[in-house]
From Swiss-Prot:
One GO process term, biological-process aspect: aspartyl-tRNA aminoacylation
CDD domains, A to Z: AspRS_core, EcAspRS_like_N
Taxonomy of the source species: Bacteria, Bacillati, Actinomycetota, Actinomycetes, Mycobacteriales
MF terms (GO), sorted A to Z: aspartate-tRNA ligase activity; aspartate-tRNA(Asn) ligase activity; ATP binding; nucleic acid binding
Site positions per UniProt: Important for tRNA non-discrimination: 31, 83
Record's keyword annotation contains Iron-sulfur: no
Protein name (database record): Aspartate--tRNA(Asp/Asn) ligase
Residues annotated to bind L-aspartate: 173, 219, 451, 492
Primary gene name: aspS
Gene3D superfamilies: Bira Bifunctional Protein, Domain 2, GAD-like domain, Nucleic acid-binding proteins
Source species: Mycobacterium tuberculosis (strain ATCC 25618 / H37Rv)
Localisation per UniProt entry: Cytoplasm
Length: 594
């Protein structure tokens, strides 16, 4: 071993011991010929002092030290002189009086100082330096503890950890695949899996009964600020269970995870129906740390002469004290709405005397003006924001406005935790809505799956898949924490006939379903058990636990929001020879024979 002790674990009780430490120079200070360094390793920091004037060789070496040199130091642990203790660090009562010094690796001029802020792109380009800093390193170490805690819970319940393939067949699952040319089969491609969904279902058919995996997943999505092309899930599947069983295990996992940061999740976690969440909060990922619920106004304005409110849906959200906002701020709300694809955000100001002002108020009837504040629960001094139009998009705008209002008014306690299960979502959604939202619709039909094509309908809706498609409810559940969906799952279809009916609704005829999912349909013919599961977004979950806004902070080597790795400069072009060898331009054999 190149060291005998961890620097950050030395204490007063170690005084008098001869130790060998190894790590990096966090700081170097020269005080009249006596040199001090803060030596940092994974355990923390210890002060090392070079003060022996007789040992000129060691002193000369110490004079050469600069920040981030990697060194090994031998010496004796001593109590610091009176008045020199540092209560800011765990080792602040001691120091190591060095007797030898070995430079293990010199450090070039740093691209940024590790104790100063740096831009994200620079941090990612030199991520190996960024991870020497306390907060980034702590986030990665927390992730390891999170993994271990989840594994411990699942081991207690006899889950089997199984690795599924990471190169497989391209199957439509709701996003674009990353494709990998198969050199030995020119013109054919593997795909990186968007999830282990199909394989974990096959494992249930295989009799594994309880499976889990900390799985890498890949989706070729459009660039978004806080998405990664590769991400991690805690993936679980169970046989002979219903939704209640899966929710119970999931709550046990979550309880164990949040215990790592000293918080006890009250269980059972409350539940809300999807339809109720959309009606009250405008989203299926409601942040319940604050109120400000949406108010339905469609019936209130049913006879309105104001053309903007002659819409399928009219809703409102109240901003407490918002009537005092200057005109420039109110105009800024319009820009805020336009950035989200809407024409604007109508508003009414409630004056201190209860009269209504703003551009909308003059278009309302006397009866509407008289009853509006009471209907939406507004008080003098408040601002009422409205959205009118299609139900889903109008509610979504108000839901976003609700969160924006809470942020601007400081209504969200950053130390609070609010968990909720969102249950009973629709099984299908219009395919055009899915594609407009940037998703990839499975099949060519008018409907596509809200979650994925393998989600089972609630048993009472099974007979109405074709006759009342838009109303069918899924036997599915999402877990939401502080407005973030951190996991989602469902009971799965385990019968071939039902799976084929669901495919048909989505525009996959029997021949196409057989071509793309024949292996799954065939497996269902061999005594497939009822089964279901859940997958947790492991990056987001860990980021919440670490108190980080971005998932990039809990990924060792993340990509930027544009999908680029500044460290390795990926993605990168390939050579002409690589392209030729890959067979990427070849026609597959079955096409050549046709």
């Amino acid at each position: 071993m190149l060291r005998s002790h961890a620097a950050g674990l030395l204490r007063e009780g170690d005084a008098g011991q001869q130790v060998t430490l190894a790590g990096w120079v966090a700081r170097r200070r020269d005080h009249g010929g006596v040199i001090f360094i803060d030596l940092r390793d994974a355990s923390g920091i210890a002060q090392v002092v070079f003060r022996d004037p007789q040992d000129t060789e060691v002193l000369a070496q110490a004079h050469r030290l600069r920040a981030e040199f990697c060194v090994s130091v031998a010496g004796v642990v001593e109590i610091r002189p009176e008045g020199n203790a540092n209560p800011e660090i765990a080792t602040g009562e001691i120091e190591v009086n060095a007797t030898s010094l070995t430079v293990l690796g010199e450090c070039a001029p740093l691209p940024f100082q590790l104790d100063e802020p740096a831009g994200e792109e620079l941090r990612l380009k030199y991520r190996y330096l960024d991870l020497r800093r306390d907060d980034p390193a702590a986030a990665i170490r927390l992730r390891s503890r999170v993994n271990a805690a989840a594994r411990a819970v699942l081991a207690r319940h006899d889950f089997v950890e199984i690795e599924t393939p990471t190169i497989t067949r391209s199957t439509p699952e709701g996003a674009r695949d990353f494709l990998v040319p198969a050199r030995l089969h020119p013109g054919s491609f593997y795909a990186l899996p968007q999830s282990p969904q199909l394989f974990k279902q096959l494992l249930m058919v295989a009799g594994m009964e309880r499976y889990y995996q900390i799985a890498r997943c890949y989706r070729d999505e459009d660039f978004r600020a806080d998405r990664q092309p590769e991400f991690t899930q805690l993936d679980m599947e169970m046989s002979f269970v219903d939704a209640e069983d899966i929710i119970a295990i999931s709550e046990e996992v979550l309880t164990e995870l949040w215990a790592l940061i000293g918080y006890r999740i009250p269980t059972p976690i409350p539940r809300i129906g999807y339809a109720e969440a959309m009606r009250r909060f405008g989203t299926d990922k409601p942040d319940l740390r604050f109120g400000l619920e949406l108010v339905e106004c469609t019936d209130f304005f049913s006879d309105t002469t104001f053309r903007v409110f002659q819409a399928p849906y009219v809703g409102a959200v109240v901003m407490p004290g918002g009537a005092s906002q200057p005109r420039r701020t109110l105009d800024g709300w319009q820009d805020w709405a336009k950035q989200r694809g809407h024409r604007g955000l109508a508003y009414v100001l409630v004056a201190e005397d209860g009269t209504l002002g703003g551009p909308v108020a003059k278009n309302l009837t006397e009866a509407e003006r008289t009853g509006l504040a009471d209907h939406v629960g507004a008080k003098p001094g408040d601002c009422i924001f409205f959205s009118a139009g299609p139900v889903k998009s109008s509610r979504a705008l108000l839901g976003a406005a609700r969160v924006e209002i809470a942020n601007r008014l400081g209504l969200i306690d950053p130390d609070a935790w609010a968990f909720v299960w969102v249950v009973d979502p629709p099984l299908f959604e219009p395919a055009d809505e899915a594609t407009a939202a940037g998703e990839v619709a499975v099949g060519s039909g008018a409907w596509t799956a809200v979650h994925h094509a393998f989600t089972a309908p609630k048993p009472e809706w099974e007979d109405r898949i074709e006759s009342d498609t838009g109303s069918v409810l899924a036997d599915a559940y999402d877990i939401v924490c502080n407005g973030h969906e951190i996991g989602g799952g469902s009971v799965r279809i385990h019968r071939r006939d039902i799976q084929e009916r669901v495919f048909a609704v989505m525009g996959l005829d029997k021949a196409e379903a057989e071509e793309k999912f024949g292996f799954l349909l065939e497996a269902f013919m061999f005594g497939a058990p009822p089964h279901g599961g859940i997958a947790f977004g492991w990056d987001r979950t860990t980021a919440l636990l670490a108190g980080m806004d971005s998932i990039r902070e809990v990924i060792a080597f993340p990509k930027t929001g544009g999908g680029v790795d500044p460290l390795t400069d990926a993605p990168a072009p390939i050579t002409a020879q690589q392209r030729k060898e890959s067979g990427i331009d070849a026609q597959p054999k079955r096409v050549q024979q046709a």
